[in-house]
A protein has these predicted regions:
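Aromatic-lined, polymer-binding surfaces characteristic
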Residues: 21-41, 63-187
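Generic detection of long, well-ordered alpha-helical segments
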Residues: 6, 48-56, 118
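Catalytic-loop region of hydrolases
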Residues: 22-23, 48, 55-58, 64
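Bacterial Sec-dependent N-terminal signal peptides
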Residues: 1-7
């Protein structure tokens, strides 16, 4: 049957969300393999980025993020003054937001729709939206951060207030499609 463009968009969003939080048989073998591989600290390959985003939840690690987040939404172990062009440590903040959002939406476990977890996500997003971190390397600003926070925004779409949605759109508008060369494959 024919769907309206809005219905098609909603279906695409739901499929994308499921690809991040699904724990079905199709993903089980990938998750099992990923569980045995130590995540890389510096990522420079699109395939590795996408695999990292599908790593199984480390509930203990995420619980640590929930315990250590500061009142302003930052974490004490992230160097927010990092000026490196490669291995920008501030991106870890975006990675944590995605991990928190995945756990919040995952149906298995005790954190599904958990209010404390949701408040930590809002706190962390608030920091990002307020401070608007920028790396000297355009890749993080135009590809790395939007590619990480985009899924988090979709996972939290129904929980974001209008101001957060506007700020999320601003982050995503940093993804530029006018580039040429190899980096086009990231977008």
């Amino acid at each position: 049957f024919a769907q309206t463009p809005q219905q098609e968009l909603e279906r695409l969003q739901q499929n994308y969300i499921q690809s991040f939080i699904s724990n079905d048989d199709r993903m089980a073998s990938l998750v099992e393999l990923l569980s045995g591989i130590q995540p890389e600290m510096e990522i420079s390959d699109q395939v590795v980025v996408e695999l990292h985003q599908r790593y199984p939840f480390n509930v203990e690690k995420i619980a640590g993020y929930m315990e250590t987040i500061r009142e302003d939404g930052s974490w004490p172990d992230i160097n927010y003054n990092d000026q490196k062009r490669s291995g920008w440590s501030v991106k870890e903040h975006a990675d944590r937001v995605l991990g928190l959002a995945k756990l919040y939406r995952a149906e298995e476990g005790d954190c599904h729709w958990e209010p404390k977890l949701e408040s930590v996500i809002h706190l962390a997003l608030g920091y990002w939206f307020r401070e608007k971190p920028v790396c000297k390397n355009w890749w993080y600003n135009q590809i790395g951060v939007p590619k990480t926070l985009g899924p988090a925004f979709l996972l939290m779409k129904e929980q974001l207030n209008p101001e957060e949605k506007e700020a999320a759109i601003e982050v995503m508008e940093n993804a530029k499609f006018g580039m040429t060369g190899q980096n086009k494959v990231w977008l």
